Amino acid sequence: MACTAMVSTNAFAKEEVKAPAPLLPLPEQKQVDWQRMETYAFIHFGLNSFCDREWGYGDTDPKMFNPKRLDCEQWVKTLIAAGMKGVILTAKHHDGFCLWPFEGNDYNVSKSPWRNGKGNVVKELSEACKKHGLKFAVYLSPWDRSRADYGSPSYVDYFHSQLRDLLTNYGPVFEVWFDGANGGDGYYGGARDKRTIDRKNYYNYPRIYQILDSLQPQAVVFSDGGPGCRWVGNEKGFAGETNWAFIPKNTVYPGYPNYPELQFGYPDGDQWTAAECDVSIRPGWFYHPEEDDKVKSPEQLADLYYRSVGHNATLLLNFPVDRNGLINPVDSANAVNFHKLIQRELGNNLVAGMKPKVSNERGGQFAAQALTDGSWDTYWATSDGVTSADITFTFKKAQKMNRIMLQEYIPLGQRVKKFAVEWLDKNGTWKAVEQGEETTTIGYKRLLRFLTVETKGLRVRILDSRGPICMNNIGVYYGGEDAQLTWSPASVAIKSVPFSLKGFDEAQLTKVVDRNPATVLFADKNELLIDLGRDTKVSTLMYLPDQSENRHGLIHSYTLAACKADGTDEHVLSSGEFSNIQNNPVLQTITFEPATTRYLKLKADRMVNDGEQIGVAELGVK
C-alpha cells in the first residue's frame, strides 16, 4: 500500500516550471544593488569653495582652505533626512587639492590652517557615514591641473597611488567616480600651459580596474563608459524617456565625444552599464554665495526624480558645502521637503496585494500575484515566445489615480521595448491615460505621471519585448489634485541696466533680453561691444549660453574690458574661464571692481569649439 500511495502522489505532482532564460547583457549583483539605492548625494567641497571657482586652476594657496565649523555629521544627518542612501565625496577635484593628507604630494589639507593641519575630510565623512548607516564613496579626478608631470607616465603612477590610498584606508565604498573632464590648460607646477592626453588610453584603465577589483570588488565604477555605471550625458539630472541599460563594450570611454547618446543607452549594446543622473541642487557644483537664492525647489527636485529614477537611472544630487563646512539650511530644507513630496505622491499603492488579470502567465511561481506582493525577488513572467501581454486591475469602486510605477526583473535582463497605460471610462471603453512621455523602455523602474482619472479599471499593455516579459512590481498612486505632470522652468529673469549691442538691430537685441533661453543671438566675430547709453557705474556682467542639446557658441575663456565706442583703449575689468560650461551651461556671472563706463567689450579669448563665434541666450549688466 505504501508503494502504491507513493506512485499515486508522484503521478499527480506538478511539473516544475522553469524560469525564463536570461537575456544578455546582464547586470552583476553589485550593479543591481547600486541601482536599488535610487538616490544618493554628491558633496563638492575643496579649495574651489573658498575662491568662487568651479574648476580650480591648480595654483590656489592651500592656506585658503579653512572651514572653521566643518561638521560631517551635519552632512550625513541632512542627507539621510533627504532620503539619500549614500554619499560621494570629491576627494580630489581637477585642481589637484586633496581633502585627505595624501603623503605623495604637498597640495592637501595638511598644508592648510584647518584643524592646525591635522584634519582629514575623507576620514571624518567616512566615519560619520559608518556611524549613521549611510553608504560612502569617493570621487577622484584623473585630471590634475596642479601637477608638473601631468601628461607623462609618472603622473599615471601617482594617480594610481592616490586611488590605492583612498581605497585602502577609509572602509568600503559603493562607487568610485572618474570624471570625464581630462586635459586642457592649467598651472601644471608653474608651466601654465595646455596639456592634451589620449583620454581613452593615458590613465591605463585596465590597470585601474584591477586595483579596484583587488581592493574594493563590491564598488561600482562610474565613468562615461562605466563599466559599472555610466554618465547620462548631461548635468541636468534626467535620462531619456527611452533608456536602455546597455552600451557597446570597449567603445565608450571617459571623455567620450558623442556623450549626448548616453542619455538613451544603446538597444544593441553588449555591456550592462545603467545611467547615473548627476545634478546639483544649485546652478554650480561648488558653493557660491550669490547662488543662495537659486536653490532648486522641492518641486523641481521631484521632477528630476521622476525623470531619472523613473527613467531607469539613478539620481546623484549634489550639495555644495559652504565655506563654514556645512550644508546650507536652504539646500537642506528643500532636499528634505523633496523627499517628503515623493513619499506623499508615491506612498499609497492602490493595487498592493491585488491579483491582476493577465493575458498570459508562465505559471508556477511566476504568477501575476508577484506583481503586487511588494517583493523584489518574485516576478510575473510570460511563456517562451510571448512578447506582448495585458495586465488588468479591476476595482470594486472607482479610484482616483495619476501615477504608475513599473519594474522589470533586471537580473534576467532588460526586455520591454514598448508599453501603454489605459483606464476604463464610465461607458466601459478603454482609453489611453493623458501624459506627455513616450512609453518605450521600463528597465529597473519606470514612473509615469498622467492626468487624474477616476476609474474602476486600469490596464497596462506590454506591446513589445526582447523576450518573455519578466516584471516584478507595479504600483498605482494618487498623488493629489495638485500633483504636477512635470515642472517647467520659469523664464530667465536677469536684472540689467538698459543697453544695446553695437552692430545688432533691435530685433536681434531682443533675443538676449526676452527672458527666453530658447532664442540665441550669434555674433559674427569673437567679441561683443555693449553700449550702456551713457556713463554708468557697473560691477557685474551676466551671460547665459545656448541652452539647446547641441549648443554652440560657448565661451571657454574671456576678457571683459571698459573701452571707447570703437572698442579701443581697453581697460581690463576681468578675465578668466567659464569652467564646465559645455556640460553645465548655467548663467555665468562676472563680477569686478565697480567701474564707470559707457562701453564694455566682452571678448572670447578661446571658444569651447574652435572656429565658432559667440552665442548668447541672455545678457545683462548691472
Each language-model region and where it sits:
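Bacterial Sec-dependent N-terminal signal peptides
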Residues: M1-E15
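Intrinsic disorder/low-complexity signature
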Residues: V7, K357, A370, I469-C470, ...
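Aromatic, loop-rich ligand-recognition surfaces of beta-strand-rich domains
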Residues: V330, N337, I342-N348, D373-E434, ...
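Structured N-terminal alpha/beta-domain signature
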Residues: S500-L521
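Mature catalytic domains of secreted/periplasmic carbohydrate-active enzymes
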Residues: K14-T387, T392-F393, M405-Q414, A432-F450, ...
